[in-house]
Amino acid sequence: MKKEILNGTRIPYELSVEELSKMLSSPIMKDFSLACEALSYKNDITAYEAMKPFINDKDKYRRLYILKTIFRHPNAAELVDFLENAISSDDLLFVDNGLIVISEYKIKVSDSLLLSVVDKHLPKLYTAVRSLTTLEICEENYSKLVALFTRAEQCSQKEFIGEVLADKYLPSKSKELFELFSCDKFAKIRLLAIKVAKKYGYDLSVFLFDEDGHVRNLANKI
């Protein structure tokens, strides 16, 4: 969503690329951030080129703000190394924001790296888990997604990983996913199992007396 205000100040979208580029050199972080926001929405290669040098800035907060904004430019898809370095960082700010960028702009990074990063930081991730939608469909990734699903402790995480599995591996893995979802402690995941069962004709009897009313109702619904 395009912001109009940043930290109480209106973002100067009306300024030229040249004027905004000068703001990038300001020692004041607020000026830098305002310029990044405005430049990131300029449909102009020169705006992207003005931002690009700051991916190597010595100030980590400037690098972080560039990470959060530069990928609005289609040309930034070339900055895979920058993005992979961000999610490989020991700094969770870079990891989380890098994963969110991958999710939002569907930037393709190494599958093995993405899975290892999500696995490493899983307990601390929320919407960043959505980066898993960019994974290729293959047996190895399926096994790793199932392992992530099994290890996840938050319902929202399991729900989203479950949706990724269902989106990418049905109908070929329908029986396995039905069984995986059926025994989950979260009702929302058992609801997902019922949807799989109804689509592929699996037995719903186990859900007819489920402790959760929503699960029972969906199982009984013709």
What annotation goes with each model-predicted range?
Residues 19-27, 50-58, 82-90, 113-121, ...:
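Alpha-solenoid HEAT/Armadillo-like helical repeat scaffolds in large eukaryotic proteins
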Residues 1-13, 22, 30-44, 49-53, ...:
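Structural detector for internal amphipathic alpha-helices that build alpha-solenoid repeat scaffolds
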